[in-house]
C-alpha cells in the first residue's frame, strides 16, 4: 500500500440506485451563467432558471457529489432530479422552506 492510496472494489459504482427520479427541462433566461451544485435544493435555485419549480420541491440533481451543472445564458437542457433523503428538512439556500419538506 502507498500512503494515501485508495483501494476500491472492482466494478462500477452506481449512484442513487432504486431512488425515484424526474426529468425537467430547464432554461437560463438570465444574462449570466448559473452553476448548480450536486446537493443544492433545486426548488430554490436562481430565479433566472425557468422550469416547473413545484416538481423540484425536495429534489436535487442526480449527479456525483461535489460536481455541478452549468447553465450558460440562453441554455436549455434536460436534467434529472432525485429526492433529498435523510430527515427531509431544508434550511438556508434561498430560505423558501426552512423546515420540513
Swiss-Prot record:
Q: Which GO terms describe its molecular function?
A: urease activity
Compartments, as annotated in UniProt: Cytoplasm
What is this enzyme's EC?
3.5.1.5
Which cysteines share a disulfide bond? Answer: none
Q: Which NCBIfam families match?
A: PRK13203.1 (NF009682), urease_beta (TIGR00192)
What highest taxon heads this organism's lineage?
Answer: Bacteria
> Is the keyword Transport in the record?
no
Question: What keywords appear on the UniProt entry?
Answer: Cytoplasm, Hydrolase
| Record family assignment | Belongs to the urease beta subunit family.
One GO location term (cellular component): urease complex
How it assembles, according to the record, is:
Heterotrimer of UreA (gamma), UreB (beta) and UreC (alpha) subunits. Three heterotrimers associate to form the active enzyme.
Biological-process GO terms, alphabetical: urea catabolic process
Name the UniProt record assigns to this protein: Urease subunit beta
Organism name: Nostoc punctiforme (strain ATCC 29133 / PCC 73102)
Q: In which pathway does it act?
A: Nitrogen metabolism; urea degradation; CO(2) and NH(3) from urea (urease route): step 1/1
Enzyme class per UniProt = hydrolase
Q: What is its main location?
A: cytoplasm
Reaction catalysis annotation: urea + 2 H2O + H(+) = hydrogencarbonate + 2 NH4(+)
Q: Which gene encodes it?
A: ureB
